[in-house]
Curated annotation (Swiss-Prot):
This is Forkhead box protein D2. Residues 47-59 have a biased composition (Basic and acidic residues). Residues 126-217 bind DNA. The lineage of its organism: Eukaryota, Metazoa, Chordata, Craniata, Vertebrata. Residues 60-74 have a biased composition (Acidic residues). The modification Phosphoserine is found at residue 96. Probable transcription factor involved in embryogenesis and somatogenesis.
């Protein structure tokens, strides 16, 4: 190897980039080998020695000067190769890498390259541009009955959009929250004969214009359900309207039932079974102004005259009805007939039954004939007709007694019974206040004695044992001495 060839090699390595890259690739190989006289053969193309990168030939004087400087700096090489070449090659290798290194990296890079390129070519699933409200609305509108459950809504969305099919469990809660929080969706309970899980969901009829021109890409505004106006009840409703529900007379079926009026817009088209509007409310509120007819019975009862305030000289009026029946009505099968009213102003035999009926009518109802205990003694089968007949005065029965004449009928007024009237004598112990039967004064005449015997008969003992006279007037029947003192106070009877 000559010195000129070494200089040409140095010039070619500095001028051509391709040659520099090849020298870089070969530097590692050269640096790793042990001395040799010649450089290894190059596989790549070589640049011409006499051609510079800019296409100018170096002058001969400059070439000779460079050659002399190289010889002085190197001072010769033991292995036959100048040191400047090795130093410059090492600097070039440590410096900026050439295109050869990039090519080497490119050759080593194609391994993982194709998989990344294949993933880029595969298009991922794109999320649909619809909101959850739009997706739910699509699902409900496509159903035949315009109502779906939560599972049916999710099934429709998964079958139509592959993006939601792959990410199913994540967005199901979002559908549930949108159904509950938006007023445009109405929950419909299941019918009793339709078993299953979950309620139905439908659209509010007033939310039809929620989307612009029927496009689900954009919602016009958030739907808010308008509250129902409060009902205006009648200031003075009639009690009959409150009891009957007011379905026919009120005109507005939702006036008394405001809770059911909220579902009136949905009707039965969506399968909503609503109760009838004519059902009465649980209970009418108390009327602030009671009806005037409410106190009609109380006013009539207050204005009715008391039966015990009849003057002594006038017969008492018959009782008005069954509540004031005779005391002997409980022992027989039929009530006592009303006495005749044509007896005149004089005393008549109807005074005693009327008094007993008026006195006992204020107490509770007696036991029925079937519930009364059987009579004891020989008077158990005593018919009611005999009791009634005993109360009547017998014109011929007064012969055995000296109190009344043959043609005169004894009086049964209060004064006559107590001994203040003619025809009867006072009982022996009446003046001392000894207690006794109230009709003991009538023991003189035969008819009155018969009445007293019948009143004190054992047949009336069970009746007296079962009848509880709780009225203050009971004392009138228990003591004959105190009866006369209380006659004056009977005019103000309060029952």
């Amino acid at each position: 190897m000559t010195l000129g060839s070494c200089c040409c090699e140095i010039m070619s390595s500095e001028s051509s980039p391709a040659a520099l890259s090849e020298a870089d690739a070969d530097i590692d190989v050269v640096g790793g080998g042990s001395g040799g006289g010649e450089l290894p053969a190059r596989s790549g193309p070589r640049a011409p020695r006499d051609v510079l990168p800019h296409g100018h030939e170096p002058p001969a004087e400059e070439a000779e000067a460079d050659l002399a400087e190289d010889e002085e700096e190197s001072g010769g090489c033991s292995d036959g190769e100048p040191r400047a070449l090795a130093s410059r090659g090492a600097a070039a290798a440590a410096g900026s890498p050439g295109p050869g290194a990039a090519a080497a990296r490119g050759a080593a890079g194609p391994g993982p390259g194709p998989p990344s390129g294949g993933a880029a070519t595969r298009s991922p699933l794109v999320k649909p541009p619809y909101s959850y409200i739009a997706l739910i609305t699509m699902a409900i509108l496509q159903s035949p009955k315009k109502r779906l459950t939560l599972s049916e809504i999710c099934e429709f969305i998964s079958g139509r959009f592959p993006y939601y099919r792959e990410k199913f469990p994540a967005w199901q809660n979002s559908i549930r929250h949108n159904l509950s929080l938006n007023d445009c969706f109405v929950k419909i309970p299941r019918e009793p004969g339709n078993p299953g899980k979950g309620n139905y969901w439908t659209l509010d009829p007033e939310s039809a214009d929620m989307f612009d021109n029927g496009s689900f890409l954009r919602r016009r505004k958030r739907f808010k359900r308008q509250p129902l106006p409060p009902p205006h009840p009648h200031p003075h409703p009639h009690p009959e309207l409150l009891l009957r529900g007011g379905a026919a007379a009120a005109g507005d079926p939702g006036a008394f039932l405001p809770g059911f009026a909220a579902y009136g817009a949905y009707g039965y088209g969506y399968g909503l079974a609503l109760p009838a509007y004519g059902a009465p409310p649980p209970g009418p509120a108390p009327h602030p102004h009671p009806h005037p007819h409410a106190f009609a019975f109380a006013a009539a009862a207050a204005a009715a005259p008391c039966q015990l305030s009849v003057p002594p000289g006038r017969a008492a009026a018959p009782p008005p009805g069954p509540p004031t029946a005779s005391v002997f009505a409980g022992a027989g099968s039929a009530p006592a007939p009303a006495p005749a009213s044509g007896s005149g102003p004089g005393p008549g035999p109807a005074g005693l039954p009327a008094f007993l009926g008026a006195e006992l009518g204020c107490a509770k109802a007696f036991y029925a004939a079937s519930l009364s205990p059987p009579a004891a003694g020989t008077a158990a089968g005593l018919p009611t007709a005999l009791l009634r007949q005993g109360l009547k005065t017998d014109a011929g029965g007064g012969a055995g007694g000296g109190g009344a004449g043959a043609g005169q009928r004894p009086s049964f007024s209060i004064d006559h019974i107590m001994g203040h009237g003619g025809g009867g004598a006072a009982p022996p112990g009446a003046g001392e206040g000894s207690p006794g039967p109230p009709f003991a004064a009538a023991a003189g005449p035969g008819g009155q004695a018969q009445v007293l015997a019948m009143l004190t008969a054992p047949a009336l003992a069970p009746v007296a044992g079962h009848i509880r006279l709780s009225h203050p007037g009971d004392a009138l029947l228990s003591s004959g001495s105190r009866f006369a003192s209380k006659v004056a106070g009977l005019s103000g009877c309060h029952f």
